[in-house]
Amino acid sequence: MRILFIAFLLLCSTLSHIAADAKSMQEIWMNMPQHFTPYLNQDLRSKLLLKPDSVSHNSINNLLGGTTTLDSLTTHYMHIQLSKAATLSLLLLPTADSDSIICMVQTYKGDQPESTVSFFTQEWQEIDNQQLWEGKSLQDMQHELLVKPKEMSEARFKQLVAIFNPMLIEVTLSPNDNTATLSPHPMFVTEEDKKDFHAIFLQRKFKWDGKMFKKVIINHFTNKSLGSTK
């Protein structure tokens, strides 16, 4: 009985230590390095978190005179409209052998959206992400976002792939199931090529398994931002 009691105390101590080490999303946001949001100082970051329960979002004036809006905040997810042209998402991803890590997606919306994805410890130490997409980097996944339809000739497909290079990738995080959706966008496409581009686009969904993102769903992608294909 004494041994069981000691084991119970050790377990409680371990759990308390883990709970103490784990950081809230608010703490992670406040401790994020300044260069990720240069037009939000610490006071503005703190002010952004003061969202009344009665509203779905909170907006503040940033240091550039624009508006920054907190769209979503949960225990493990945060989405912020930094400006009209930029968004930032933070998602805490569980790991098997350590604390949850931070997945950060920064999306810039010019003529077409483009995302960069970074991974960090909860102390904001960057993690090598060259193998976190099925053992590959995000850029290595580009070729998997295009597919040749049966009715399209090989020559036409290769022509479109050449025109499509370089490709812009938009990444969307889902806090509900720890997934990331990759959507391809061309830097430029003519009206003549638009319909064929719709035919070769793929939207791929990846689910976090505790170590990396792995493919789970493949969908043909209709990019509304390219306009009608009629």
Locate each region found by the language model:
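Terminal domain-start segments
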Residues: A20-P94
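Short aromatic loop motif centered on NTY/YTY
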Residues: Q130-D209, K214-V216, H220-K230
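Mid-length scaffold segments of soluble, non-membrane domains
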Residues: I101-K136
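Bacterial Sec-dependent signal peptides at the C-terminal "C-region" and cleavage site
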Residues: L11-K23
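Sec-dependent N-terminal signal peptides
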Residues: I3-S13
